[in-house]
Amino acid sequence: VENRAGYIQDQLQQAQELTDLSTYINETTQQMLDDETLSLKTLDSSSSDSLPLLLAAAPRMLETLRSKRISGIFLILNTHDFTGRTSGDRLPCVYLRDLDPDAAPSVVNSDILLECAPSELVQTFDIATDKAWSPALQYLDGEQDVFYVRPFQTAYEDNERMGAANYGRWTTLPYKLLGDDHEAIAYAQPLILDDGTVYGVLGVELLESYIDTKLPWDELQNDHHGSYLLASTTSDLKGEVLALHVTSNTGEQSVPLQNAKWELTLQRSNNCWYYMMDGKQQIASIRQIGLYSRNAPFSGERWLLVGVVGKNDLFSFSQ
């Protein structure tokens, strides 16, 4: 579990490193504001007003998608307080997806899909649209919006204005895009100009199906019993009880966890973590995954990789 946790931590940290891309987008935005190609008053009101910025950002986003082991990348423009928005509002957006990031990239980008982008960008960018393609991202005021709303709103409401990456957050709940059946988690951070204006969100996506390939549960025990859980908690890791929210999982615990609505409570006994599932004791090994700096707004959401093997399976060799 320790080695696998180190590997997952490296993957997630590499995915969330967006400094170069966010700097480019911020500088491009500022230049377009200075020469009046863009206006902050209308930036998020229609795709045509934001089109110059989306057209400039999209090629760099594609480069970043290619250079990282991620399944998606997105840019969402918004200059307004989300608490004042209504369900159905449309936000200018470019959302690119690669269903198989580990495969050799196509020279003509035939492996990339546009989930969301204005039709003018689709025509010039020469990338196919997915079946649920939309010209703008529809704000629905629900769980499916949390992946981009939380980082934006936290920065928007913070008068101190830290660096944008400090507001970055990984979603603890998988989401689906409207009309799409792929479950994903995302890391998103706000876009902030030098004067403190928060004008959008930049982020990366990892499909649940892709994360599963990075959690080979059969390595946990020789007889191919066990499960990996990628989870988060706000509990004290030094305590005797851990309330977990499971974000991704592979192995034998998938169905029972689904029935438990992905919530799990671990107890500690003799320095060993365990929980009961369907009347059987499961032994858990836990390693923390460091994703946030200590003072970041979401540092209280601690990420863990949990390896699980049933007690009977774990000790079967000695019986």
Could you say what each language-model-derived stretch is?
Residues 1-57, 69-71:
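Juxtamembrane extracytoplasmic/periplasmic/luminal helical "stalk" adjacent to the first N-terminal
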Residues 9, 27, 59-68, 178-179, ...:
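Short regulatory alpha-helical segment in sensory/regulatory domains of signaling proteins that mediates
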Residues 56-61, 197, 201-248:
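Solvent-exposed, extracytoplasmic
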Residues 62, 69-82, 225-231:
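Short, hydrophobic-rich beta-strand element in sensory/regulatory alpha-beta domains
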Residues 72-85, 94-97, 154-175, 301-303, ...:
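Tryptophan-centric aromatic hotspots in well-structured domains and transmembrane helices
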Residues 77-138, 233-236, 240:
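GAF sensory/regulatory domain recognition
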Residues 116-203:
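Extracytoplasmic/periplasmic ligand-binding sensor regions of membrane-associated signaling proteins
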Residues 181-204, 208, 250-319:
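Extracellular/periplasmic juxtamembrane segments that couple receptor/chemosensory ectodomains to their
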